[in-house]
């Protein structure tokens, strides 16, 4: 059994500073002036304690890539997609994983524990999807990561993309994304 006592927390809906007693990962009591024996006592000195944040739209496969291989000088989505295609030619699974892990750690440090990322599932080698599935497994004790199979190059505009999307789902992606503004439909 593990216990944590968080002292002097500022919480939404509470006028006064509040204490939180956590027993085996569950809030056992929330109130002022709590005094329980605990394995760990943390005085947060009036800082905000809240439920974790959710970042519902990330592209962890593309993070930390500004200027690689070049800058998007027009600022348009189409140029950005073209640059992504150029970047994919030399992008390794290890680079994707390292960048994703770094950004996940930043997210967690800033209060996010639930993340949804889009993974380029139409990239023909499967590198992106495999990398992010591995990162999800590696980081599962730190964050809840949902992976959306994202058709960066559309589903129906290119032969074989339907199969790539289906494969991404079989490998373990949680949802299917889309690009309705670019898809032939």
Predicted regions and their residues:
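Di-metal (Zn2+ and/or Mg2+/Mn2+) metal-binding site signature of metallo-dependent hydrolases
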Residues: 47-69
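Hydrophobic alpha-helical hairpins/lids featuring a short glycine-rich hinge
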Residues: 51, 82-126
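Conserved, mostly hydrophobic/aromatic
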Residues: 46, 57, 111, 132, ...
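Metal-coordinating catalytic core of metallo-dependent amide/deamination hydrolases
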Residues: 90, 117-185
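Active-site gating loops and adjacent loop-to-helix segments of metal-dependent hydrolytic enzymes
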Residues: 64-96, 172-175
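Histidine-rich, glycine-flanked metal-binding segment
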Residues: 1-51
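Short coil/turn connectors at secondary-structure junctions
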Residues: 1-2, 38-39, 45, 110-113, ...
């Amino acid at each position: 059994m593990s216990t944590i006592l968080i002292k002097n927390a500022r919480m939404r809906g509470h006028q006064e500073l509040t204490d939180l007693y956590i027993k085996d990962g569950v809030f056992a009591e929330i109130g002022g002036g709590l005094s329980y024996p605990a394995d760990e006592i943390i005085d947060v000195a009036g800082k905000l304690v809240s439920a974790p944040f959710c970042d519902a739209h990330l592209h962890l496969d593309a993070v930390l890539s500004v200027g690689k291989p070049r800058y998007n000088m027009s600022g348009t989505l189409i140029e950005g997609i073209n640059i992504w295609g150029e970047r994919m030619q030399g992008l390794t699974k290890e680079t994707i994983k390292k960048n994703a892990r770094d950004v996940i750690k930043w997210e967690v440090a800033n209060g996010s524990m639930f993340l949804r990322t889009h993974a380029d599932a139409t990239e023909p080698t499967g590198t992106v999807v495999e990398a992010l599935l591995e990162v999800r497994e590696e980081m599962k004790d730190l964050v809840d990561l949902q992976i959306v199979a994202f058709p960066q190059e559309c589903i129906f505009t290119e032969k074989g993309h339907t199969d790539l999307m289906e494969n991404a789902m079989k490998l373990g992606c949680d949802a299917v994304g889309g690009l309705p503004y670019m898809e032939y439909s």
